[in-house]
Amino acid sequence: TEENVTGIAMTPYTPQGKSLPGLRRNDTYYTSLPTNSVQAVMINKIFVDKAETGAYGLQPVWPTTLAHELGHYLGLFHVFSGGDNGQTTDYCEDTPDYDRPAYDTWLASVYRPTFAQAAQRQDRNGTTFTSYNIMDYYYSYRDRITPDQRARIRHVLDYSPLIPGPKIAVENMSRAEIIIEEPLILK
């Protein structure tokens, strides 16, 4: 429901010749921005003036939500997986992947953990780490990206035609205006 969603973002697409794993590919290139399809980041107005309260104090929700959603808009994915499949979900080798449902279970079992304790995770190899990544959820410092994430962002900025800014030319691309139907929306 909208009361539970703090923000959403559309992910970019990259040209066929310069694609990135996990992102949509297209073999055409926009010559101008479409008028009936908007690539955007949205923050739920319910959360703009709201602060999370709890054992860790009062913290505004929207600044980290905005940074997180901008990460999606620039080609980043969550740094956790949803269960037993053991698959890294963000296509970045330098972000530790952890099992989010297992973390949820652990967190629910601990009586009033400190923020530092709640920010601890165990990766798929059993190694404990502290969550600092902006693409994480829950209790995390959420103030960093990794070099691989930076490289993905740079690639999207250089090649994705719907992100403003100068682009690196891609050979053998048609210059037709095409509207992408059903953009991928991440929460």
What are these regions (language model features)?
Residues 18, 121-124, 175, 187:
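Surface-exposed charge patches in extracellular/virion surface proteins
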Residues 1, 129, 151-155:
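Extended N-terminal export/anchoring regions of large proteins
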Residues 49, 53-144:
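The catalytic-center signature of Zn2+-dependent metalloproteases
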Residues 1-81:
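Active-site-proximal segment of zinc-dependent metalloprotease catalytic domains
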Residues 8, 115-118, 168, 175:
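Residue-level detector of intrinsically disordered, flexible termini
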Residues 139-186:
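Pan-zinc metallopeptidase signature
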